[in-house]
């Protein structure tokens, strides 16, 4: 039967069956500039597949494909979109591993699929603050070894009367993605065994962490004005750390490649064979996986309990005038467990969000601006006349250029400059009134 030997049909059927997750995937790509990194991982998978196709005998993983496709269909109504997509790409990994790489499961391809998912914003939200704490502590130790009296408080390094903010790029989330992307490509090209893949990823993570520690250390000297550099000094330090990190990852993986070259990579050469019964079961599972999302969509709009806040009428001594919600606020209003209001004080636009519990729905202002097409550039930490800390950035779109600052606070003077730090604190402090204030004004 022609279908039996047509492996590409199997993969195409899977792709069609998983239509719902692709719809979610491309929606996320269209609403965040950061998530477009995932396209690089997809391109890498396609290129690696066609490179290996001519070198490797295909094997059939159809039983694993059938099981994972069924798991996708059964779990679809209960899993959030990201986890559904993980199940879908796991099933695709089984198919691609068997056809293109002659293996039951290629963890290098799977890691590239995972990196292709829209996870950068989520990684920044959940891991950004812990990684900044870790990097800040290590940076403080290095600076002390160099004779400087420095201590870390939150995500700031204090030196005398100066406070140097460990900014979001220093958390290394984007460098973590890039480093793991590079490592995934290399372990796939060299067809590493599982043991070598794990070793490569562990070493890559350590190198990425080290690179970010040295980046934060260099930026401390610059921000604390202990050294003088041109205006592009900040970018130069970041680019240098990035290049050295990538070189380190390549060097280590090449070294790992030479370990025990006789080690088996578990490549199989049993041929690609599928029985008529397996074909029928596979097609039935694909049909079920295709249909389930149609019936599940209507059950996913659970009602969100929205907290109601007593919004201020005066901000920094100026009377506030309420405005209608703009495109930025409307985009993130769905399922937001609180209130959002937009004001002006005559010169600036002020967005105030109110929640009473830790939630992933409280996005950073930079994510909101990025989602509707603004390019974002971080600015140094701002300390206002009331000694309050603000995280700031510039947002540009066409001819429009804005300076935007944000902070989150409670009535008892607790405050945070980014949502990741706030989230981890709010997890253990439920049922408080949290106010997220974003101030945007035209850049001079």
Give the role of each language-model region.
Residues 1-444:
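Hydrophobic N-terminal alpha-helices or hydrophobic patches in metabolic proteins across all domains
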């Amino acid at each position: 039967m022609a279908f039996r030997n047509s492996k590409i049909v199997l993969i195409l059927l899977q792709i069609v069956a998983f239509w719902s997750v692709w719809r979610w995937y491309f929606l996320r790509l269209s609403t965040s500039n950061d998530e477009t990194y995932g396209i690089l991982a997809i391109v890498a998978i396609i290129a690696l597949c066609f490179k290996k196709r001519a070198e490797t005998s295909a094997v059939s993983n159809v039983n694993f494909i059938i099981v994972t496709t069924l798991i996708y269909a059964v779990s679809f109504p209960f899993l959030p979109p990201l986890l559904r997509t993980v199940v879908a790409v796991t099933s695709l990994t089984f198919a691609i591993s068997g056809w293109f790489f002659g293996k039951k499961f290629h963890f290098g391809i799977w890691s590239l699929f995972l990196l292709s998912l829209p996870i950068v914003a989520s990684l920044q939200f959940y891991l950004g603050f812990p990684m900044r704490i870790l990097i800040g502590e290590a940076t403080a130790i290095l600076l002390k070894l160099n004779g400087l009296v420095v201590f870390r408080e939150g995500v700031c390094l204090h030196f005398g009367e100066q406070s140097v903010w460990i900014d979001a790029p220093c958390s290394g989330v984007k460098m973590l993605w890039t480093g793991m992307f590079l490592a995934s490509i290399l372990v796939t090209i060299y067809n590493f065994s599982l043991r070598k893949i794990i070793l490569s990823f562990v070493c890559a993570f350590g190198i990425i962490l080290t690179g970010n520690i040295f980046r934060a250390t260099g930026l401390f000297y610059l921000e604390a004005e202990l050294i003088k550099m041109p205006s592009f000094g900040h970018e130069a330090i970041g680019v240098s750390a990035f290049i050295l990190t990538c070189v380190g990852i390549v060097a280590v993986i090449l070294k790992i490649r030479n370990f025990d070259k006789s080690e088996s990579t578990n490549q199989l050469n049993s041929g690609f064979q599928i029985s008529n019964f397996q074909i029928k079961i596979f097609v039935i599972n694909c049909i079920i996986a295709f249909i389930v999302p149609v019936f599940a969509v209507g059950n996913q709009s659970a009602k969100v309990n929205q907290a109601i806040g007593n919004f201020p009428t005066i901000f920094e001594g100026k009377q506030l005038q309420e405005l209608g919600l703009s495109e930025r606020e409307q985009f993130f209003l769905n399922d937001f467990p609180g209130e959002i209001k937009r004001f002006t004080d005559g010169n600036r636009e002020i967005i105030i969000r109110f929640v009473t519990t830790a939630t992933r729905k409280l996005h950073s202002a930079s994510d909101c601006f990025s989602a509707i097409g603004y390019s974002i550039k971080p600015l140094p930490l701002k300390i206002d006349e009331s000694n309050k800390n603000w995280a700031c950035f510039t947002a540009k779109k066409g001819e429009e250029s804005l300076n935007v600052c944000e902070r989150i606070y409670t009535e008892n003077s607790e405050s945070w400059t980014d949502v990741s730090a706030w989230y981890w604190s709010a997890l253990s402090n439920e049922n408080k009134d949290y106010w997220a204030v974003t101030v945007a004004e035209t850049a001079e």
